[in-house]
Amino acid sequence: DLVPAHVRKFFFWIAPALTAAPAFLCICIIPFGSSITVFDQPVKLVIADIDAGPLFVFAIASLSVYGITFAGWASNNKYSFLGGVRSCAQMISYEISLGLSLIPVLMVFGQLNLSDIVHSQADNGWTLLPLWNEHGSVFDAAYWQNCKEQWLLMIPLTISFIIFTTSIFAETNRMPFDLPECETELVGGYHTEYSSMKFALFFLGEYAAMIVGSAIIVTLFFGGWSLGF
């Protein structure tokens, strides 16, 4: 585990943890399933079933910007610094579209509890694929008599899905939004000077953020754990 002599050591050491910790904290509010019974007691398959799930994710995930800022500045390297500046600018910019894109979805469900949103989709069809509702499935005549509003809502919800998914790609530095760490320009971005476990923590945090983003997309748009049959 090499630590270059020219770095600002305290901030250099703390930056990987500040980057990875928010991503792992966000996993706490993801509902992985319905309740199970353990010793005759119902247990929810979510660590923290709070009533402001998406807001919690936005609030905590934005803290990783500080870790990236420290990493770029503390490395005392022009490539790392430029990578950190690029990453911070990109993350802050796309957080706006990330938050605004969820407003139509949350207005449809009228709540912020992710478990309740999944239960609502289990009863009335997925957000983007309302193939069933309380009157039956697409194979029932009663369904087609009471599904016009659901299919009309797909227009704004599909736009929300596209914007949200694109913003998740940008927030996690995936192609084609990999400007902060493009090797042809910035060598390795803000983790150029890092090695060993500190280097691994950056990537663990990045991939944990990808898992959280994917889980939120599935929870809000594709029914979470519910299959509808």
Model features per residue range: what roles?
Residues 1-229:
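Selective transmembrane helix interface/packing segments
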